[in-house]
Each structure stands twice: as C-alpha cells, then as structure tokens.
Amino acid sequence: MPWTRGDVATKGTFKMLTPIERRDFLSWSTHGLTATAVWHLLSRHDGLRAATVPSEAADPPPHLPVRCKRVIHLYMCGGLSHLDSFDYKPLLEKYHGQSLPGSEKPETFFGKIGLLRKNDWEFRQHGESGLWISDLFPHLGSVADELTVIRSMVADSANHTPATFQANTGFRLNGFPVLGSWMSYGLGCETDDLPAYVVLPDPRGFPAGGTINWSNGFLPARYQGVAFRTKGQPIDDLFPARSADVPAGQTSFGSPDSEADTREFIAALNRHHQETRPESDLIARMNSYELAAKMQLSVPRVTDLTGETAATQSDYGLDRAETAEFGRSCLLARRLLEQGVRFVQLFAGGSFGSPRINWDGHENMKENHAQEALRVDQPVAALLRDLRQRGMLDDTLVLFTTEFGRTPFAQSEANVLGGGRDHNMYGFSVWMAGGGLKHGMSYGATDDIGWKSVDRQVTWPDFHATVLGLLGIDHTRLKYYHNGIERRLTNVHGEILQDILS
C-alpha cells in the first residue's frame, strides 16, 4: 500500500497513513527521482570531482600497458578520397586521362570505369617528418608531425551503410555494439555525472544507418552513445516540462519546502527498496534516471563555451561561418574529455541527398571535397594543437576515419574523363594521433595508382584491436556472452599494428 505525501520518512523508517491513488503516486515519484539525483549532485562538497564508474567487463582491463585513457573519433561520412588527401600518387598525374592499364576490370559500385584522374590538389611534404599531405588540408599539414597515417586500409563493402557499420562495429550488419560502447563497457567512466560515450552528429543530418552507429547492440543499454546537439538545447527533454500555471517562486512540486520533502521521501523509498529487493535491473533503471538528473547541471556547464578565450574560439574557427559548426564540436569534445568522458565521436557529414552533404564525391570531386574540407580542416588542427598545449594529447587517442576511399579513375563511361570518383573498398587512408604512437609516419601502402592495398594491409579488426591495445585492452579478452556466443569487437580476427606503437 502506498504512503501518503504527508508521511515523510525519517531515518529510513515508514509508517502507514491514508492511501493515495497509485497513478498519483507513480507520477509524483517519477518527479522525485529527478529531484533526488539533483539533490545528490548539489550536496557534494565543493571541489569534489564526480565519482568514477567502474568497468563491468568479466575480465576487466588493463590487460596491456595503458598508453591512452580516452578517445576522440572524427568520422568523415561518405568516403573521403585518400588520393586527394593523404596518399600521394605521382603516377596518376603522369597517366591522367589514360585508360586503366592491364586486363583486369575492377568491380565498382556503379559499374563505370572512366579514365585515370589525377588528384585535384597539390601534395607537399610537411613538418620535420616530411609527411605527404595535399593542399586540401593545409591546416592539418601544419600538425603533420602529430599524425600516424595508415595508407593500407581495406573494407568489406562499397555500400555506405554496411561499410559505415563495419567501421564502427567491425560488422556489416546492424545489431552489434560500436567501438565507443565496447570501450565504455571495458573501462567504465571517469565521471558519474556525464555519459561515458558522447556523440556529436553533424547538424546537417545523421550518417548512413542513422543512430545505429552509436548503438550498444547487445551490450546493456547504458553503454549506448548519448547524442548532444552542438547548438541550441543539447539534449531533448533533459529538463522536466513545467506547467504554465505554476506561480512565480514555486516549482512543479509546489513550494520549495514541499520539493525538499519529496526529495527526502523518495530517497528513503529507494534505500528501503534496495535493502529488501536488490534487483540489478531496477537498480540500473534508477541509475539511469539519476544520471539524467545529474546531467541537468553538468550538461549546461560543459556545453557553455563562453568561458573559452577569444583566441581559442578563433583558433577552432568559431568566428567563421564555414568552420563554426565543426569547430564547436571539436572544442566541445575537448571539454567533455576534461570532465571525464571516455569516448567522444564527431560525425562530419550527413546521409544522402542532393546537393550532397558529405564526402561522397561522385559528380564533382573538387567542388565536393573542397566544401567538406573547409568545414573540418582548421578545427581538427586546432584540436590537436589544443590537446598538445594542455598536456592532454599524451594520454588521448584521436582517430580520423572514413568508410572507404575513392577510385583512381573517374566515375564515367569508358574513355571519358569525368569529374567524380566512385567508392573504393580495396585501399584507403585513415590516421591516428596521440599517446603511444610513432608520430609523423605512414604505415602500409596502396599500389602505384592508389587502387588496392598492397603493403601491410589493415582491416577494421586490426584497426580496432590496435585502438583497444592502446587503451590497455586485449581485444581477445574483452568479451560479452550473447546468444550462446562469446562476442568480441574484433570477432575472431585482428592483430595489433605493433610497428606504429612507440
């Protein structure tokens, strides 16, 4: 039988008074959960950092030396051309406008094999390392000595949606946990008032496959990514709706004294229930409500960029229309890491449409990639500099990936030199930066025209195994039992790329 509102518990004991309606009790107690959690957050001593959330893995890390403890993942939606960015192929200029040599007929997504096409941007060597980067990314060229470029990536699909799933989960089908979810499951979180895994989608739209790209899959729901908006209200329905007829100076609970009574009463109910019925599912649900309530204070604080200096905001490009959106995401990513978030994922580009809002340069590579690079180049370089200046890059891993590359020949009819490139899953480039890596280097190679990976080929399981290894996680030991199978991010594959580790 429920208790009446007037029966506020004292020291965890209760006494039965007049019954109230179940519907009224449930409505009232739901509001109380939020109030209780906020009260818990506000009651902390000044200067006391939020508590950590431990790993729930059966075989918790570290299994290996810990080189990094947090990750920023920059994902370029649509298929960034390696040939126009990080994989210099001088022979393409020599053979520009000629047919593909040899008798092999490549398999392409749209089935069109035009003439060979040179890159649209000049390549230059940058930094002390002499790393080749094209003029598509002049700002990234200025931080070339921070980059570890992998030029021999391969994927198993040339279709955007399954290829994007594979880049994030290791599998082409949906229903599997993404990298950020596995990391949260394995390492826990360094704060209990923000999620372990935060996603910053492109305001123009979601990536191919939508929100599945930050799904927990079969892992517990608390390990899914939590999407923030980078402008406006960061999260829908984070704050409870307030009735228009609530008098000034009062809350939806009534007077401030009534709200305090509610907090105390619900806290006592929770304690009593956990002592008598310690059910994990219910405790997990209560924890999720509590996290949401804590985020009512932590999210506005971490997303408020007004405390950043004008110089910092300008460096990230917040003062330019072309760079402001992604610049804000990059700056917010750094702030989230500072508050204890483990994994922040930024998507550059939305899904399909016309005009294109991603890196899918089928029709006009020069126009398409120039537009997208302008949005991200300056902010990403600023992020690397900022992390380095703050001493954070030594224990932070930055990933810059895409689902596949582009073909060295034009997407056009035979003997025609078109302006676009088709999808290429046989060879493309990604890069890493941060702690535990050899900087200013490239690993692996595609063939002379950039069509196929031919030297030290890297698969997504290899890439994911290396990321987990840098975090101190043995990818063969991070498992979750599901439907009779011990599942892993890397399935039964994957080798750590030892040659890129410092």
Regions found by a protein language model. Name each.
Residues 3-502:
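Ligand-binding pockets and gating/stacking loops
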